[in-house]
Amino acid sequence: MRRLCAAGETVRCLVRAGSPGLSWLESHPVEIVTGHLLEADAVAAACKGAHRVIHLAAPIPEGREAVVERVHREGMALLLEGARATRVERFLMVSPLGTGSSSSLPFLRSRGWAEDQLRESGIPSVILQSSLMFGLGDRLVSGMIRLLQRTGLLLIPGAGKTMLQPIWVGDVVSCLLRALQNEDALDRTIPIGGSQHLTYEEIADQVAKMLNIPRVKVHLSRRAVGWISRVLEGLGLNPFLGYRHLELLEVGTITALDAVRRSFGFQPMPLIEGVAYHILPQREIGSQGPPSGVVRGTRTRDQR
Protein backbone atom coordinates (compact mmCIF):
# COMPACT_ATOMS: atom_id res chain seq x y z
CA MET A 1 0.00 0.00 0.00
CA ARG A 2 2.74 2.48 0.94
CA ARG A 3 4.68 1.74 -2.22
CA LEU A 4 1.60 2.18 -4.40
CA CYS A 5 0.91 5.54 -2.74
CA ALA A 6 4.56 6.54 -3.16
CA ALA A 7 4.24 5.77 -6.87
CA GLY A 8 1.34 8.21 -7.13
CA GLU A 9 -1.42 5.61 -7.30
CA THR A 10 -4.84 6.19 -5.75
CA VAL A 11 -5.43 3.28 -3.38
CA ARG A 12 -8.70 2.02 -1.93
CA CYS A 13 -8.77 -0.76 0.69
CA LEU A 14 -11.62 -3.04 1.75
CA VAL A 15 -11.10 -3.65 5.48
CA ARG A 16 -13.21 -5.44 8.06
CA ALA A 17 -14.60 -3.29 10.89
CA GLY A 18 -12.44 -3.84 13.96
CA SER A 19 -9.48 -5.09 11.94
CA PRO A 20 -6.17 -4.51 13.78
CA GLY A 21 -4.81 -2.77 10.69
CA LEU A 22 -7.67 -0.29 10.34
CA SER A 23 -6.22 2.49 12.51
CA TRP A 24 -2.87 2.13 10.75
CA LEU A 25 -4.54 2.48 7.35
CA GLU A 26 -6.43 5.55 8.54
CA SER A 27 -3.10 7.29 9.10
CA HIS A 28 -2.19 6.91 5.42
CA PRO A 29 -3.51 8.62 2.27
CA VAL A 30 -5.84 5.81 1.19
CA GLU A 31 -9.58 5.47 0.69
CA ILE A 32 -11.12 2.97 3.10
CA VAL A 33 -14.26 0.92 2.57
CA THR A 34 -15.28 -0.85 5.76
CA GLY A 35 -16.90 -4.22 5.24
CA HIS A 36 -16.47 -7.94 4.68
CA LEU A 37 -15.61 -9.85 1.55
CA LEU A 38 -19.01 -11.55 1.80
CA GLU A 39 -20.92 -8.24 1.87
CA ALA A 40 -21.99 -7.46 -1.70
CA ASP A 41 -22.48 -3.72 -1.14
CA ALA A 42 -19.05 -3.31 0.46
CA VAL A 43 -17.30 -5.26 -2.29
CA ALA A 44 -19.13 -3.29 -5.00
CA ALA A 45 -18.17 0.00 -3.33
CA ALA A 46 -14.54 -1.09 -3.08
CA CYS A 47 -14.41 -2.05 -6.77
CA LYS A 48 -16.30 0.98 -8.12
CA GLY A 49 -14.14 2.92 -10.56
CA ALA A 50 -11.06 0.76 -9.92
CA HIS A 51 -8.66 0.03 -12.75
CA ARG A 52 -6.91 -2.83 -10.96
CA VAL A 53 -7.80 -5.18 -8.12
CA ILE A 54 -5.29 -6.87 -5.79
CA HIS A 55 -6.91 -9.71 -3.82
CA LEU A 56 -4.93 -10.56 -0.69
CA ALA A 57 -7.72 -11.55 1.70
CA ALA A 58 -7.64 -15.10 3.08
CA PRO A 59 -9.43 -16.50 6.15
CA ILE A 60 -6.24 -17.98 7.62
CA PRO A 61 -7.25 -17.69 11.33
CA GLU A 62 -10.66 -19.27 10.66
CA GLY A 63 -10.81 -22.89 11.83
CA ARG A 64 -14.20 -23.86 10.39
CA GLU A 65 -13.76 -25.35 6.94
CA ALA A 66 -17.29 -24.42 5.84
CA VAL A 67 -16.57 -20.74 6.55
CA VAL A 68 -13.21 -20.90 4.75
CA GLU A 69 -14.85 -22.47 1.70
CA ARG A 70 -17.62 -19.86 1.70
CA VAL A 71 -15.18 -16.95 1.89
CA HIS A 72 -13.11 -18.38 -0.95
CA ARG A 73 -16.05 -19.24 -3.22
CA GLU A 74 -18.57 -16.47 -2.53
CA GLY A 75 -16.00 -13.79 -1.79
CA MET A 76 -14.30 -14.38 -5.13
CA ALA A 77 -17.66 -14.42 -6.92
CA LEU A 78 -18.53 -11.00 -5.47
CA LEU A 79 -15.10 -9.61 -6.32
CA LEU A 80 -15.39 -10.81 -9.91
CA GLU A 81 -18.87 -9.32 -10.16
CA GLY A 82 -17.52 -5.97 -8.98
CA ALA A 83 -14.50 -6.23 -11.28
CA ARG A 84 -16.70 -6.90 -14.33
CA ALA A 85 -19.03 -4.03 -13.46
CA THR A 86 -16.15 -1.56 -13.37
CA ARG A 87 -14.25 -3.24 -16.23
CA VAL A 88 -10.96 -3.57 -14.36
CA GLU A 89 -7.84 -3.80 -16.49
CA ARG A 90 -6.06 -6.36 -14.33
CA PHE A 91 -6.89 -8.59 -11.36
CA LEU A 92 -4.06 -9.84 -9.13
CA MET A 93 -4.37 -12.58 -6.54
CA VAL A 94 -1.89 -14.08 -4.06
CA SER A 95 -2.23 -17.68 -2.83
CA PRO A 96 0.08 -20.15 -1.06
CA LEU A 97 2.26 -22.46 -3.12
CA GLY A 98 0.46 -25.75 -3.57
CA THR A 99 -2.96 -24.15 -4.00
CA GLY A 100 -5.17 -26.19 -6.31
CA SER A 101 -8.67 -27.61 -6.53
CA SER A 102 -7.25 -31.14 -6.19
CA SER A 103 -5.18 -30.42 -3.05
CA SER A 104 -5.61 -32.75 -0.09
CA LEU A 105 -5.65 -29.76 2.30
CA PRO A 106 -9.08 -28.10 2.59
CA PHE A 107 -7.69 -24.54 2.70
CA LEU A 108 -5.56 -24.98 -0.43
CA ARG A 109 -8.37 -26.84 -2.18
CA SER A 110 -11.00 -24.12 -1.64
CA ARG A 111 -8.45 -21.43 -2.48
CA GLY A 112 -7.89 -23.39 -5.68
CA TRP A 113 -11.59 -23.15 -6.47
CA ALA A 114 -11.30 -19.36 -6.13
CA GLU A 115 -8.32 -19.35 -8.49
CA ASP A 116 -10.31 -21.38 -11.01
CA GLN A 117 -13.13 -18.83 -10.88
CA LEU A 118 -10.65 -16.08 -11.71
CA ARG A 119 -9.08 -18.03 -14.59
CA GLU A 120 -12.51 -18.74 -16.08
CA SER A 121 -13.78 -15.16 -15.67
CA GLY A 122 -12.14 -13.73 -18.77
CA ILE A 123 -10.72 -10.83 -16.73
CA PRO A 124 -7.00 -10.17 -17.41
CA SER A 125 -5.31 -11.64 -14.35
CA VAL A 126 -2.11 -12.67 -12.63
CA ILE A 127 -2.00 -15.27 -9.85
CA LEU A 128 1.09 -15.35 -7.64
CA GLN A 129 1.54 -18.54 -5.63
CA SER A 130 3.95 -17.68 -2.83
CA SER A 131 5.99 -19.72 -0.40
CA LEU A 132 5.61 -18.85 3.29
CA MET A 133 6.29 -15.15 3.84
CA PHE A 134 8.20 -13.54 6.68
CA GLY A 135 8.22 -9.95 7.88
CA LEU A 136 7.50 -7.84 10.92
CA GLY A 137 4.56 -9.41 12.78
CA ASP A 138 4.43 -12.66 10.81
CA ARG A 139 3.88 -16.07 12.39
CA LEU A 140 6.75 -17.97 10.80
CA VAL A 141 9.72 -15.90 12.03
CA SER A 142 8.36 -13.10 14.23
CA GLY A 143 6.26 -15.63 16.14
CA MET A 144 9.33 -17.82 16.60
CA ILE A 145 11.33 -14.82 17.88
CA ARG A 146 8.56 -13.80 20.28
CA LEU A 147 8.35 -17.31 21.77
CA LEU A 148 12.13 -17.59 22.04
CA GLN A 149 12.54 -14.22 23.76
CA ARG A 150 9.75 -14.92 26.25
CA THR A 151 10.46 -18.54 27.08
CA GLY A 152 13.87 -19.55 25.72
CA LEU A 153 12.12 -22.36 23.84
CA LEU A 154 12.47 -23.33 20.21
CA LEU A 155 9.31 -25.31 19.58
CA ILE A 156 9.66 -27.53 16.49
CA PRO A 157 6.51 -29.10 15.02
CA GLY A 158 7.16 -32.75 14.21
CA ALA A 159 10.65 -33.65 13.00
CA GLY A 160 11.16 -30.12 11.63
CA LYS A 161 12.41 -31.50 8.31
CA THR A 162 9.70 -30.11 6.03
CA MET A 163 11.40 -28.07 3.30
CA LEU A 164 10.40 -24.39 3.10
CA GLN A 165 11.48 -21.39 1.05
CA PRO A 166 10.80 -18.29 3.16
CA ILE A 167 10.36 -15.06 1.20
CA TRP A 168 10.43 -11.56 2.68
CA VAL A 169 7.04 -9.86 2.32
CA GLY A 170 8.70 -6.80 0.78
CA ASP A 171 9.92 -8.98 -2.08
CA VAL A 172 6.38 -10.29 -2.58
CA VAL A 173 5.24 -6.67 -2.83
CA SER A 174 7.94 -6.06 -5.46
CA CYS A 175 6.59 -9.02 -7.45
CA LEU A 176 3.05 -7.63 -7.18
CA LEU A 177 4.09 -4.17 -8.37
CA ARG A 178 5.91 -5.63 -11.35
CA ALA A 179 2.99 -7.93 -12.13
CA LEU A 180 0.77 -4.83 -12.33
CA GLN A 181 2.83 -3.58 -15.27
CA ASN A 182 4.41 -6.66 -16.85
CA GLU A 183 2.49 -7.79 -19.93
CA ASP A 184 4.36 -11.12 -19.92
CA ALA A 185 2.77 -11.94 -16.55
CA LEU A 186 -0.81 -11.67 -17.80
CA ASP A 187 -3.05 -14.72 -17.48
CA ARG A 188 -0.34 -16.75 -15.77
CA THR A 189 0.01 -18.52 -12.44
CA ILE A 190 3.51 -17.64 -11.25
CA PRO A 191 5.24 -19.43 -8.36
CA ILE A 192 7.51 -17.29 -6.18
CA GLY A 193 9.78 -18.13 -3.25
CA GLY A 194 12.86 -17.00 -1.39
CA SER A 195 16.49 -17.52 -2.28
CA GLN A 196 17.02 -20.56 0.01
CA HIS A 197 15.51 -23.97 0.61
CA LEU A 198 15.55 -24.50 4.39
CA THR A 199 13.90 -26.94 6.77
CA TYR A 200 11.80 -25.50 9.57
CA GLU A 201 14.51 -26.57 12.03
CA GLU A 202 17.21 -24.83 9.99
CA ILE A 203 15.14 -21.63 10.04
CA ALA A 204 14.77 -21.93 13.81
CA ASP A 205 18.50 -22.54 14.28
CA GLN A 206 19.45 -19.50 12.17
CA VAL A 207 17.05 -17.23 14.04
CA ALA A 208 18.21 -18.48 17.45
CA LYS A 209 21.85 -17.98 16.49
CA MET A 210 21.17 -14.37 15.49
CA LEU A 211 19.39 -13.64 18.77
CA ASN A 212 22.20 -15.23 20.78
CA ILE A 213 19.75 -16.34 23.47
CA PRO A 214 20.27 -19.58 25.44
CA ARG A 215 17.55 -21.88 24.18
CA VAL A 216 16.02 -25.29 24.63
CA LYS A 217 14.85 -27.04 21.48
CA VAL A 218 11.65 -29.04 21.93
CA HIS A 219 10.10 -31.26 19.27
CA LEU A 220 6.35 -31.77 19.61
CA SER A 221 4.01 -33.65 17.33
CA ARG A 222 2.17 -31.48 14.83
CA ARG A 223 -1.05 -32.68 16.42
CA ALA A 224 0.05 -31.30 19.80
CA VAL A 225 1.22 -27.98 18.34
CA GLY A 226 -2.01 -27.74 16.36
CA TRP A 227 -4.07 -28.28 19.51
CA ILE A 228 -2.11 -25.55 21.32
CA SER A 229 -2.60 -23.18 18.37
CA ARG A 230 -6.35 -23.83 18.21
CA VAL A 231 -6.75 -23.21 21.95
CA LEU A 232 -4.76 -19.96 21.83
CA GLU A 233 -6.58 -18.73 18.72
CA GLY A 234 -9.91 -19.62 20.35
CA LEU A 235 -8.93 -17.43 23.31
CA GLY A 236 -8.12 -14.56 20.98
CA LEU A 237 -4.39 -14.95 21.58
CA ASN A 238 -1.68 -15.01 18.92
CA PRO A 239 0.18 -18.34 18.86
CA PHE A 240 3.67 -18.55 17.38
CA LEU A 241 2.24 -20.61 14.51
CA GLY A 242 -1.33 -20.56 13.30
CA TYR A 243 -3.28 -23.71 12.54
CA ARG A 244 -3.19 -22.99 8.79
CA HIS A 245 0.58 -22.57 8.86
CA LEU A 246 0.86 -25.99 10.47
CA GLU A 247 -1.19 -27.43 7.63
CA LEU A 248 1.28 -25.99 5.13
CA LEU A 249 4.14 -27.53 7.10
CA GLU A 250 2.62 -30.92 6.32
CA VAL A 251 3.27 -30.54 2.61
CA GLY A 252 6.11 -28.02 2.36
CA THR A 253 6.05 -25.03 0.05
CA ILE A 254 8.99 -24.70 -2.32
CA THR A 255 9.62 -23.79 -5.93
CA ALA A 256 12.72 -23.15 -8.05
CA LEU A 257 15.32 -20.97 -6.34
CA ASP A 258 15.47 -18.67 -9.37
CA ALA A 259 11.68 -18.38 -9.79
CA VAL A 260 11.52 -14.70 -8.80
CA ARG A 261 14.56 -13.74 -10.86
CA ARG A 262 13.19 -15.46 -13.98
CA SER A 263 9.73 -13.89 -13.70
CA PHE A 264 10.50 -10.49 -12.18
CA GLY A 265 14.20 -9.82 -12.67
CA PHE A 266 15.56 -9.65 -9.11
CA GLN A 267 16.89 -12.00 -6.46
CA PRO A 268 14.91 -12.21 -3.19
CA MET A 269 16.52 -11.31 0.11
CA PRO A 270 18.08 -14.22 2.06
CA LEU A 271 16.45 -15.11 5.38
CA ILE A 272 19.29 -13.90 7.59
CA GLU A 273 19.41 -10.50 5.88
CA GLY A 274 15.65 -10.06 5.96
CA VAL A 275 15.44 -10.90 9.66
CA ALA A 276 18.38 -8.63 10.51
CA TYR A 277 17.07 -5.52 8.81
CA HIS A 278 13.31 -5.92 8.73
CA ILE A 279 12.38 -7.79 11.92
CA LEU A 280 15.08 -7.55 14.59
CA PRO A 281 15.88 -4.11 16.02
CA GLN A 282 19.59 -3.35 15.59
CA ARG A 283 20.12 -3.43 19.35
CA GLU A 284 19.20 -7.13 19.35
CA ILE A 285 21.86 -7.91 16.76
CA GLY A 286 24.58 -6.61 19.05
CA SER A 287 27.32 -4.04 18.80
CA GLN A 288 29.50 -6.05 16.45
CA GLY A 289 27.54 -5.06 13.34
CA PRO A 290 25.37 -7.27 11.16
CA PRO A 291 25.53 -11.06 11.47
CA SER A 292 27.85 -13.07 9.29
CA GLY A 293 26.61 -13.14 5.70
CA VAL A 294 24.81 -9.80 5.87
CA VAL A 295 26.37 -6.98 3.87
CA ARG A 296 25.02 -3.60 4.90
CA GLY A 297 23.40 -1.61 2.11
CA THR A 298 23.72 -4.26 -0.58
CA ARG A 299 20.13 -3.90 -1.73
CA THR A 300 17.32 -1.60 -0.72
CA ARG A 301 13.63 -2.11 -1.23
CA ASP A 302 13.45 0.64 -3.86
CA GLN A 303 16.26 -0.93 -5.89
CA ARG A 304 14.20 -4.04 -6.51
What are these model-predicted stretches?
Residues 145-157:
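A short C-terminal helix-loop "cap" of Rossmann-like NAD(P)-dependent dehydrogenase/epimerase domains
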Residues 139-140, 159-181, 187-191:
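Substrate-positioning beta->alpha
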Residues 9-17:
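Conserved glycine-rich Rossmann-like NAD(P)H-binding loop of the short-chain dehydrogenase/reductase
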